[in-house]
């Protein structure tokens, strides 16, 4: 059952302890942790080793792997970065501060996935969210590249915005 932002993100991101390429071709690991924007495998491994503080272990297929605790540490840092980036952005922080805790989770989820700058491109949706016009905001969000690229996840997040509940995560 999803009851926290951590649960929500783990549900949406999943957790993979081996390095993989995300839908954009970037090396990722753990709970949606983007290792680097460099698409070269060795550069990703070096960056990962720097982040975890030691030489990475390899699995039987010679793929880099991390432990659950390393995954959790990367996740905690990423979650902190997402939250701080919301709080430090004048536009988003104003909207975010006036939301209930459930809808705040939806905004954090979007920023975790796309980053603040991409979330800020949802100008009309954010205006409608600020005005607490939930159904209109949801309709606007459904008409987005984000919704077409990751429909399952985005529809869950949009439902959270629209209903103020976590029912989409049951």
UniProtKB/Swiss-Prot annotation:
Enzyme Commission number, as recorded: 3.2.1.17
Enzyme class label: hydrolase
Catalytic activity: Hydrolysis of (1->4)-beta-linkages between N-acetylmuramic acid and N-acetyl-D-glucosamine residues in a peptidoglycan and between N-acetyl-D-glucosamine residues in chitodextrins
Keyword S-adenosyl-L-methionine: no
Manganese listed as a keyword: no
GO biological process: cell wall macromolecule catabolic process; defense response to bacterium; killing of cells of another organism; peptidoglycan catabolic process
Keyword terms, alphabetized: Antimicrobial, Bacteriolytic enzyme, Glycosidase, Hydrolase
Signal peptide segment: none
MF (Gene Ontology): lysozyme activity
SUPFAM superfamilies tied to this protein: Lysozyme-like
Active site: 13 (proton donor), 22 (nucleophile)
Organism superkingdom: Eukaryota
UniProt xrefs under PANTHER family: T4-TYPE LYSOZYME 1-RELATED
Family indicated by similarity: Belongs to the glycosyl hydrolase 24 family.
This protein's name: Probable T4-type lysozyme 1
Source organism: Dictyostelium discoideum
